């Protein structure tokens, strides 16, 4: 089904919303200085994906309880749960805005204050907060596949730049220790913490009881892309440089190009994909904040 009816979204739209909202934050923030790098990251990612598959099943079973938190958990506890999730949304949104504030002046538009960029970003994203889940689903239906396909093409174009000596350098088996695997495992779980918001979304999904495979499929897709990046980044840039770069995907984008150097600034296209995903993620957080306020009886959400 391409578009769901009755103000609900289809499983395909759910899948593409998850891809759109999480892809850019993952690509930009997980790797590099203080992040998850090396062969131990691959092992940690695989283990985290297995646990997340079971976690999704639990979240879907909890969906009816999240439809009205006050009714399900009582007035005090229900509102406390709502405040907890609302704080998460605020902190995550602030982090993404800070990321946007840094990336746009550094990579796309020079001479413009990052504060103004963050301000207009939040204004633009807030306009869609009350448009309903189905409109967000249709937006993801149209653009989600393009974004995913574009990122896959970007990775494919970067493969010829890989160097065998860099790749062998990244395969430092002496770093595959229990501690490093635990750190990578924990880091991936933290990165996927936004999955905890699924119960606030599933109520608007057609036949949400059978949407577990779809949500797990989106997580698996993102996980496979992460594993690909964990192997590609050190093979192209070198393991030592990866550990020194705050956002190693940016120099990776600089080197991505079509054969024959068809476009002089091909990296701008890829940066545009990531920027669009970041804006969708911020808009998603605003939408979930509105849902949390309403379902936890914290207000009407009109001022959100």
For the regions a language model picked out, list residue spans one by one:
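Membrane-helix interface motif
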Residues: 94-98, 158-167, 235-246
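Short, Lys/Arg-rich, polar N-terminal cytosolic tail immediately upstream
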Residues: 1-11
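Membrane helical hairpin/interfacial module
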Residues: 27-116, 120-123
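Helix-loop-helix connectors at the membrane interface of multi-pass transporters/channels
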Residues: 97-115, 203-225, 284-304
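Membrane-interface loop-to-helix entry segments
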Residues: 115, 128-158
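Membrane-interface interhelical connector segments
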Residues: 236-266
């Amino acid at each position: 089904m391409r578009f769901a009816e009755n103000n609900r979204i289809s499983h395909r739209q759910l899948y593409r919303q998850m891809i759109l909202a999480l892809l850019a934050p993952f690509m930009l923030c997980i790797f590099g200085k203080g992040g998850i790098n090396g062969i131990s990251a691959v092992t940690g990612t695989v283990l985290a994906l297995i646990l997340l598959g079971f976690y999704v099943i639990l979240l879907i079973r909890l969906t009816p309880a999240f439809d009205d938190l006050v009714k399900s958990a009582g007035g005090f506890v229900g509102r406390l749960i709502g405040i907890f999730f609302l704080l998460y949304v605020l902190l995550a949104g602030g982090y993404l805005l800070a990321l946007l504030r840094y990336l746009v002046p550094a990579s796309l538009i020079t001479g413009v204050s990052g504060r103004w960029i963050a301000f207009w970003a939040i204004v633009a994203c807030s306009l869609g907060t009350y448009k309903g889940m189905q409109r967000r689903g249709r937006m993801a239906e149209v653009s989600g596949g393009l974004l995913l396909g574009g990122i896959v093409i970007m990775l494919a174009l970067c493969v010829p730049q890989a160097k065998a000596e860099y790749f062998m350098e990244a395969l430092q088996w002496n770093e595959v220790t229990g501690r490093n695997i635990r750190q990578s495992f924990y880091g991936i779980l933290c990165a996927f913490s936004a999955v905890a918001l699924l119960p606030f979304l599933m109520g608007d999904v057609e036949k949400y009881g059978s949407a577990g495979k779809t949500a797990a499929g989106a997580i698996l897709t993102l996980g496979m892309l992460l594993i690909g990046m964990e192997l590609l980044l050190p093979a192209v840039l070198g393991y030592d440089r990866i550990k020194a770069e705050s956002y190693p995907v940016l120099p990776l984008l600089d080197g991505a190009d079509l054969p024959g150097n068809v476009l002089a600034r091909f990296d701008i296209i890829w940066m545009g994909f990531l920027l669009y995903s970041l804006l969708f993620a911020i808009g998603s957080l605003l939408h979930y904040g509105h849902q949390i306020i309403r379902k936890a009886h914290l207000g009407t959400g009109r001022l959100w």
